[in-house]
Amino acid sequence: MNDINFAVLGTGGIGRRALEFSADKDELTPIAACDRHGVAVNHDGLDVDELLAATEGNIASDGGTTVESGGDDIKEHGDDKGVVASTQAEPTETPIEDIIAEHEAIDAVLIALPNLEHDFIPTVAERFANAGYEGVLVDVLKRSRVIGMLDDREEQLEESGITFVCGAGATPGLLTGAAALAAQSFIEIEEVEIWWGVGLKSGYEDNRGTVREDIAHLPDYDIESARALSDEEIEEIVDAHDGVIEFNDMEHADDVLLERAGICDAEDVTVGGVLDLRNDEKPTTTTVKVTGRTFDGEVGTNTFELDDDTSMEANVNGPALGYLKAA
């Protein structure tokens, strides 16, 4: 297999773990990474250990607001902020453009940015296409409606030579694929239920984008209102749930992707789960249940479970990097 030089956009919880995960993949070499305020580039390969150590507990803003800063600051430890704390990095006000400027050296890009505006990820893809990038873009986006926005750019992406792999994490991603396989026992699908459990003892501080995006799925919230929440307000929501938040009927793109694969109608797919921000142990087992009718008239349910010891980071980044290599 050919060696793949890749970049990571976003060094929050998902981005950091992707860099760490890649260290065990000899064929993957991270050569660039950025957050809102800094960019690190080394065509020979980033020193991942140094970058992770420098940014530990110093993760860039997720795009929401803070009471003190109005949205421009990030959590600070010492004089430097986020990626800039690394000796490999430089401060910048145009991090994505700086990565795009290196596109000739980059085979693939993992987009690990919070999708707190519906068209944000599609717009990022468009910017790579406009720059003449030829390669792979992999995203772990969640929202169903974003798939259609990417469709609107399909011709442009193809003409540029970009392969865009969307929904490449756990849900959508790994669990969507499991549902598609489990569905093969049936000639007609009645229901697909995806129920996930995630434990993140590191809490909101180190998983800001993930938590903020999930809060947007709660009753009385949406992308716009979740984006407007301050860090303190999100902490209050977490505290009000004693650190354990349950989600139902989430707008995850598993529904659209399964419909496009000819598995079932999007309306027959439900996604929900439980997020524990006080413990690393999963609060519930991640499960996929596919109910359908077999060719001989029986109605049954195939069930697929993830082991409770496989973390969210492993189940998101493993598939994402796998798709990145395969594409």
Segments (PLM) and residue ranges:
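N-terminal glycine-/serine-/threonine-rich beta1-alpha1-beta2 phosphate-ribose binding loop
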Residues: 2-130
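C-terminal helical cap and adjacent loop that interface with cofactors, partners, or active-site loops
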Residues: 296-327
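Rossmann-fold NAD(P)-binding glycine/threonine-rich loop
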Residues: 115-164
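Active-site-lining helix/loop region of Rossmann-like oxidoreductase modules
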Residues: 9, 184-306
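Short, ordered loop/turn segments at secondary-structure junctions
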Residues: 36-38, 141-143, 169-170
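A contiguous active-site-proximal alpha/beta segment in oxidoreductase catalytic domains
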Residues: 146-207
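Nucleotide donor/acceptor-binding cores
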Residues: 2-4, 135, 190
